[in-house]
Amino acid sequence: MKNLLDLSYDELVSEITSLGLERYRADQILDWVFDKKVNNFDEMTNLSKQHRALLKEHFTIPFLKLLEKRVSKIDGTTKFLWELEDGNTIESVMIFHPGRITACISTQVGCPVGCTFCATGMSGFVRNLTTGEIVSQILSMEKEEGKKIGNVVYMGMGEPLLNYENTIKSIRILNHKKMGNIGIRRITISTVGIPEKIIQLADEGLDVKLALSLHAPTNFKRDQLVPLNRKYSVEEILNAIKVYQMKTGKRVTIEYVLIRGVNDEISDAKKLAEILKGLKVFVNLIPVNPTVAGLSKPSRQRILAFKRILLENGIEAEIRQEKGSDIEAACGQLRLKRKVSSP
């Protein structure tokens, strides 16, 4: 049987009509799934019993199994631990802002990148998520909380561009007006920098936002923080960003986790401003969050000095206010909390 959440709109219409159902039945099914959060064909009462029985023979609509939910006492940020059908686990986060709700979703079980300041990488890599598993995080959170998600950031567990096809397909599903109906400009992909995939993304015709997790201005320092940098250098990544901007004209957010004594020197700030010169970027400075790595954030004075250097050199920058750090839901804190099975 096929997972209905793996299917694009056109694929679903094709599947439905091949079973002898009218085309408009696809819209009825999607209304039940995406609007009403119903994943049981028996509850789809505007379909005949015969049609429901037929659909059950061919499709499943698996929402995720909730294992644990933690709510921040500081800001209401909510973290969900989900179990997948094969017993593996992932985490997703719902973040509340005035007038909007943002979901932070995962694209892989674990992560192959292994950033030294990130808890996810410490768990190792198990497998890519399917398109349906990515989409189901949104539906499962909305069903659990009874609230509509308006913004999505692909900043959870995993590197989205190393699960490229499923990530892109999930974005198209979440954006489709008869499916997720989330505005394309309200969707952000965060990447450590896979040059060929950044350029491929530019050709997709998707008006998503792109965030680059840079974290260091030199290869020497970035090699230590982001091991994948040994394969893709800072220069290669920034060249890909240049091509991306030539093709799309879009500004790119640069994410920079500040770690005391590692990448927070004034010389780091000056070098960062130098390598970003000429690019259309905005820098998010993120004081490192507590993880088992034992790294610590710089002093407030040092963070402000770092930001000031960037501003003085014409680089827009802000200090990101992290949400959910008390429940390990902030940047770099998501991880596998239970034993995982091998692929």
From Swiss-Prot:
Domain Radical SAM core per the UniProt entry, residue ranges: 97-326
The record, for Pfam families, names: Radical_SAM, RlmN_N
What's this protein's family per the entry? Belongs to the radical SAM superfamily. RlmN family.
The primary gene name is rlmN
Q: Which Gene3D superfamilies match?
A: 1.10.150.530, Aldolase class I
Q: Which organism is it from?
A: Thermotoga neapolitana (strain ATCC 49049 / DSM 4359 / NBRC 107923 / NS-E)
What molecular function terms (GO) are annotated for this protein?
4 iron, 4 sulfur cluster binding; metal ion binding; rRNA (adenine(2503)-C2-)-methyltransferase activity; rRNA binding; tRNA (adenine(37)-C2)-methyltransferase activity; tRNA binding
Which residues take part in binding [4Fe-4S] cluster? C111, C115, C118
The lineage's top-level taxon is: Bacteria
Q: Where, per UniProt, does this protein localize?
A: Cytoplasm
Active-site positions on this chain: E91, C331
Its annotated function is as follows:
Specifically methylates position 2 of adenine 2503 in 23S rRNA and position 2 of adenine 37 in tRNAs.
Q: What is this protein called?
A: Probable dual-specificity RNA methyltransferase RlmN
Cysteines paired by S-S bonds = C104-C331
Key words, A-Z: 4Fe-4S, Cytoplasm, Disulfide bond, Iron, Iron-sulfur, Metal-binding, Methyltransferase, rRNA processing, S-adenosyl-L-methionine, Transferase, tRNA processing
Binding locations of S-adenosyl-L-methionine: G158, E159, S190, S213, L214, H215, N289
InterPro entries hit by this protein: Aldolase_TIM, Elp3/MiaA/NifB-like_rSAM, Methyltransferase_A, RlmN_N, RNA_MTrfase_RlmN, rRNA_lsu_MTrfase_RlmN/Cfr, rSAM
Cellular component, GO annotation: cytoplasm
